Amino acid sequence: MGRGKLEIRKIENKTNRQVTFSKRRNGIMKKAQELTVLCDAKVSLLMISSTHKLHHYLSPGVSLKKMYDEYQKIEGVDLWRKQWERMQEQHRKVLELNSLLRREISRRMGGDLEGLTLVELSALQQEMEEAIIQIRNKKYHTIKNQTGTTRKKIKNLEERHTDLVMELEAKFRGPQFAIGEDDPRNYEAAAAAAVYGNDVAAANLFALSRHPIT
């Protein structure tokens, strides 16, 4: 009993689909090689699978460009003309946009004003005035932020300075560090504490007594 006719339709199972593609791809490649050898034909074969993998075959000594050129020559068509025309149109639009932007920049710098009507000049003036207002507001905002940051730094330094002064006052508040300029005994006691006590605070106090800060 012969085999039934295989219905040609998409294979839904991905694994089966890939297996079938590989088998039939190899068969087509083999047929293309046979046509090249047996019939001295120029064969170009391109295949892209459902997984977006490219498979191709070209007869020995033949390039894809040569095949395209020969096809265009035989058929009398230009495969690239529409693409070239599209690229030319895009290039023209880019040049026009570039020229327009250069002219707008020049006008905002006070140049290329010839030919503008009174309405156009008034509109340009209004745009420039609005731009100046935005720039001024941005400048004031930046100055305000920087001023606030500087004030915070100054406040922190002042608080640190106050803490240091309070620490020094607490350290020198004891009677052993009291200095009386009119009492030589207090002066000698501070000097002795600085020399023999090896105390940094006492040494500083002694130095201040000799060279007071005014």
Swiss-Prot record:
Compartments it resides in: Nucleus
Domain K-box: 84-174
GO CC term (a single one): nucleus
Matching InterPro entries: MADS-box/MEF2_TF (IPR050142), MEF2-like_N (IPR033896), TF_Kbox (IPR002487), TF_MADSbox (IPR002100), TF_MADSbox_sf (IPR036879)
One GO-annotated biological process of the protein: positive regulation of transcription by RNA polymerase II
Tissue: In flowers. Not found in vegetative tissues.
Keyword annotations from UniProtKB, A to Z: DNA-binding, Nucleus, Transcription, Transcription regulation
MF terms in GO: DNA-binding transcription factor activity; protein dimerization activity; RNA polymerase II transcription regulatory region sequence-specific DNA binding
This protein's record includes keyword Zinc-finger: no
Residue ranges of domain MADS-box in the record: 3-58
Name listed for the protein in its UniProt record: MADS-box protein CMB2
Species annotation: Dianthus caryophyllus (Carnation)
